[in-house]
Amino acid sequence: MPHEPKGLNEECGVFGVWGNPNAASITHLGLHTLQHRGQEGAGIVGLTKDGMRRHYGLGLLSEVFTNTDQLTPLIGRAALGHVRYSTAGGRVLENIQPLLFRFSDEAIALAHNGNLTNAISLRRQLEDQGAIFQSTSDTEVLMHLIRRQVGQPWLTQLKTALNEVHGGFAFVLLTEHGLYAAVDPHGFRPMVVG
């Protein structure tokens, strides 16, 4: 059958590193250990001296990163990686994470495992208010909710947005100032921090 999975599929895998000059390489290795959680696509965002850089694509991690030279542009003190198994949104390049958002005041990378059960209604509400979405993934909804809080301290923006989403989720966000992790109130999605 043409669309049968080749093996074990779970959800997604998310891996982040902060404060290590080999962050992109460590993230790449970490994603190898999580490959069983997602085989549709992979990506890494590196926080470099020149800002955030991203390499991503459809397929297995080994198909997206065919040689270690592809990690060179991502070298910096922090990185965020993701292997995708879609539960919301299509199997298209625009949905491969981490999603990278560049704003006039900052850049934010966002990776997510789980499902937002109110994503459709939130997306409609945000679109009615003028939001423009670049993907069909429910992940992008969180960033639009965060950016509605501009002017508030970063953690207030993040907490306010997280209080608006429902479902089982684990989010990791990378900014120039830190790596932030959040899980749903019931802890349905696995998250290890340390």
Curated annotation (Swiss-Prot):
Sample GO molecular function, one term: amidophosphoribosyltransferase activity
Sequence ranges assigned to domain Glutamine amidotransferase type-2 in this UniProt record: 12-194
Keyword terms of this UniProt record: Glutamine amidotransferase, Glycosyltransferase, Purine biosynthesis, Transferase
List of catalytic residues: C12 (nucleophile)
Catalytic activity: 5-phospho-beta-D-ribosylamine + L-glutamate + diphosphate = 5-phospho-alpha-D-ribose 1-diphosphate + L-glutamine + H2O
Pathway where this protein functions: Purine metabolism; IMP biosynthesis via de novo pathway; N(1)-(5-phospho-D-ribosyl)glycinamide from 5-phospho-alpha-D-ribose 1-diphosphate: step 1/2
EC code: 2.4.2.14
InterPro entries: GATase_2_dom, Ntn_hydrolases_N
GO biological process assignments: 'de novo' IMP biosynthetic process
Positions of the propeptide removed during maturation: 1-11
Known role: Catalyzes the formation of phosphoribosylamine from phosphoribosylpyrophosphate (PRPP) and glutamine.
Family listed: In the C-terminal section; belongs to the purine/pyrimidine phosphoribosyltransferase family.
Name of the protein in its database record: Amidophosphoribosyltransferase
Source organism (scientific name): Lacticaseibacillus casei (Lactobacillus casei)
Underlying gene: purF
